[in-house]
Amino acid sequence: MKRGLQLVLMLCVFLLGTQVSFAGGLLGGTGVSDARVYDSEGLIKIQTLAIADSIYNGPTSEGEPEIDDIPEILMNGTLVDKKNVLNYISYREVCQNIKIARHIDILRLDSRKAFKEYKNNIGLYADAYVITTISNGTSMNDGTRLNVFFDVYNARTNKIVYAYRKLAPKSAVRDSLLYTEIAKDFFSDFIDAQKQAIEDKEKEDKAILKLEKEEAKKAK
């Protein structure tokens, strides 16, 4: 009887573990990540995040997303924000707004001029923008692991606020699913980082208030 219960418990644990693995989108995971907050005050103030044009030279292996697929993949990544903590605006939407307001079609400019116009105008539409840089080597067989960098900049000062990097497993299949899951990982971690920054600020404010009250009592 005891042995039977142990087997049932082991099966439940196995099934639960399998469910969690698939819930992440990929059984093998999306790799290792690291993140850094450069400006916690700026991070707290972000309510609208714009998805800027990505830096990507195109697929180097079969099944990898095309350049034109990346904007949709990044926007699909925002779906992880089920509580709508942030507002998101796509690159094309920003370009359309600039075209209407400034009569400048960014989509027709070369990458350098387009980025300059984007930086000069993005502050009208968002609090921050994220630039995604994809480093995928020359082929899947060249030994290079997929590296994806997400750098978030203040839309008004263009100073970096937050950086996130994902290093995919060497054996990972570089398809749209992997890229989408990596995007979801970024947005999820970004939201968590903002939440943590808010909590830290609240604790700091309470500590300062407590100290001020203690100093006021001593002064009486």
Model-derived features: positions:
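Hydrophobic beta-sheet segments that form the core/acyl-binding groove
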Residues: T132
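Bacterial N-terminal signal peptides
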Residues: V8-Q19
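Solvent-exposed loop/turn segments at secondary-structure junctions
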Residues: Y56-P59, E93-Q96, S135-M140, A168-V173
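Short, charged, low-hydrophobicity "junction" segments
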Residues: T18, A23-L26, K99-I106
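N-terminal segment of the mature soluble domain
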Residues: T48-I51, G58-G123, Y129
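C-terminal/domain-edge helix-coil "capping" segments
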Residues: A23-A50, L109, N120-L124, S139-K220
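Bacterial N-terminal signal peptides that target proteins for export
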Residues: M1-L9
